[in-house]
Regions:
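N-terminal [4Fe-4S]-dependent radical SAM core
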Residues: 1-41, 46-104
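Hydrophobic faces of well-ordered beta-strands that scaffold small-molecule active sites
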Residues: 21-25, 103-105, 137-139, 164-168, ...
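Conserved SAM/AdoMet-binding glycine-rich loop
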Residues: 95-185, 192, 199
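Glycine-rich tight-turn/loop motif centered on a GG-T
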Residues: 176-187, 251-259
Length: 325
C-alpha cells in the first residue's frame, strides 16, 4: 500500500507492471429496477445508467429489454458489432490521451448480468475478442441477478493472464436505507452473492454511497465493517450525487435532502477508509456524473483537489486505511 490508502493505480502497477486503463462498454442491457413493474429504478438513478466519457454521445441508445425474445436474439449480432466499435473508439481515445498499453474490458452501463446466460456469453466473448490481451474483465451488476450459471460462465472466462471481477452494488448495509432508495434487494442478498462469487474464483468489488437519506457516520462505519467482513477485493466509495431526473431530485427540490459538501465528505471518507482492511483496493473515492445531468452538489471541487486534500488530511492526523480495525 502506497500513501494513506491502497489505491487502484498502485494495485494495477504492482500486479501488471504498468498502468491499466478501463475500456467501458455498453452492452445494451436493462435493469430489473427499471423494467415493466413500474418501480422506476433506484432513487439516485436518472435512467441513463453509467456510461464511459468516450461513449456518452450514445447514451440510452439501446433497446433495453430483459426478456429473451426473437427481437433480442436477433439484436445480438448488432450488439456484438457495437461492442467492437465501442472498444475501437475507446482504445483509440485511451492510447491517444494516455499512451495506454494495457486494458481492462469493463461492462459498465446498467445491470450487465440481467439476461440469459447464452446471451451473456456471446456478448462477453465479443468484447474480449475486440480487446485482445485484456488483463481484466469487469462486470458491473446487482447481487440479485448473479445466478450460479452466470458465475460459472464468468469463472470460465478467467485465464492465467486475465482476471475476472464482479462489481456488486450495495450502497448501504442498512436494509431500511435500501428499501427507501428502492434497491430491490437486501444486504443479505449482497452478502450471499459475494460469497458465491468468491467461491467461483472471481474477484469482487462493491459500491457504497456516503450521504444517502437518513444515514450518518454510524451507518457508514457499519457498512464499511460489513463490506470488510464479506472479504471483498475492492471497493468504490461514492459521494452522493443527485441527478436531475432522479427521484432524489424531488426530495432535494423540496428541501428534505442535501448533498454533502467537500469538508463533510473528507471526514466521512477518511472514517470509512480507516474501517477497511489495508488489502482492499480502493477503486474510487468520488462519484462521476456528467455535469449537465447533475443537480447537486454543483460546487464540489474536482477529483484532484479532493484527493489531494484527503491525502493531506490523513497525513496531518497520522491516519491510514485500516488503522481502526
Amino acid at each position: 500500500m502506497s500513501g494513506r490508502w491502497h489505491s487502484y493505480s498502485s494495485y494495477l502497477k504492482s500486479t501488471y507492471g504498468k498502468p491499466v486503463y478501463r475500456i467501458g462498454l455498453d452492452g445494451g442491457f436493462s435493469c430489473p429496477n427499471r423494467d415493466k413493474d413500474g418501480r422506476g429504478g433506484c432513487a439516485f438513478c436518472d435512467g441513463t445508467g453509467s456510461v464511459a466519457q468516450y461513449q456518452r454521445s450514445s447514451e440510452s441508445g439501446f433497446f433495453r429489454d430483459s426478456s429473451y425474445t426473437d427481437e433480442v436474439a436477433n439484436s445480438l449480432l448488432p450488439r456484438a458489432q457495437s461492442l467492437s466499435a465501442q472498444a475501437d473508439r475507446a482504445e483509440a481515445f485511451l492510447r491517444r490521451r494516455y499512451k495506454a498499453e494495457l486494458f481492462s474490458v469493463y461492462f459498465q452501463a446498467f445491470t450487465n448480468t440481467y439476461a440469459p446466460v447464452e446471451e451473456l456469453e456471446r456478448l462477453y466473448r465479443a468484447a474480449l475478442e475486440a480487446v485482445p490481451g485484456a488483463v481484466e474483465l469487469i462486470i458491473s451488476t446487482r447481487p440479485d441477478t448473479l445466478g450460479d450459471d452466470v458465475l460459472a460462465l464468468l469463472s470460465s472466462l478467467r485465464t492465467e493472464e486475465r482476471a475476472v471481477w464482479v462489481e456488486l452494488g450495495l450502497q448501504s448495509s442498512n436494509d431500511e436505507t435500501l428499501r427507501r432508495i428502492g434497491r430491490g434487494h437486501s444486504a443479505a442478498c449482497w452478502e450471499d452473492a459475494v460469497r458465491r462469487a468468491k467461491e467461483a474464483g472471481l474477484k469482487v468489488s462493491s459500491h457504497v454511497i456516503l450521504g444517502l437519506p437518513g444515514e450518518g457516520r454510524e451507518d457508514y462505519v457499519r457498512t464499511a465493517l460489513f463490506v470488510d467482513k464479506a472479504g471483498v477485493d475492492g471497493i468504490k466509495i461514492h459521494n452522493l450525487h443527485i441527478p436531475g431526473g432522479s427521484r432524489l431530485a424531488e426530495e432535494y427540490r423540496e428541501g428534505v435532502l442535501t448533498a454533502p459538501g467537500m469538508e463533510r465528505e473528507l471526514e466521512d471518507t477518511e472514517l470509512v477508509l480507516r474501517h477497511l482492511s489495508p488489502g482492499i483496493v480502493i477503486q474510487r473515492l468520488l462519484a462521476d456524473t456528467p455535469f449537465h445531468r447533475l443537480m447537486a452538489p454543483r460546487d464540489f471541487p474536482d477529483k484532484f483537489i479532493f484527493l489531494t486534500r484527503l491525502e493531506e488530511r490523513m497525513t496531518a492526523y497520522g491516519t491510514r486505511q485500516g488503522d481502526l480495525l
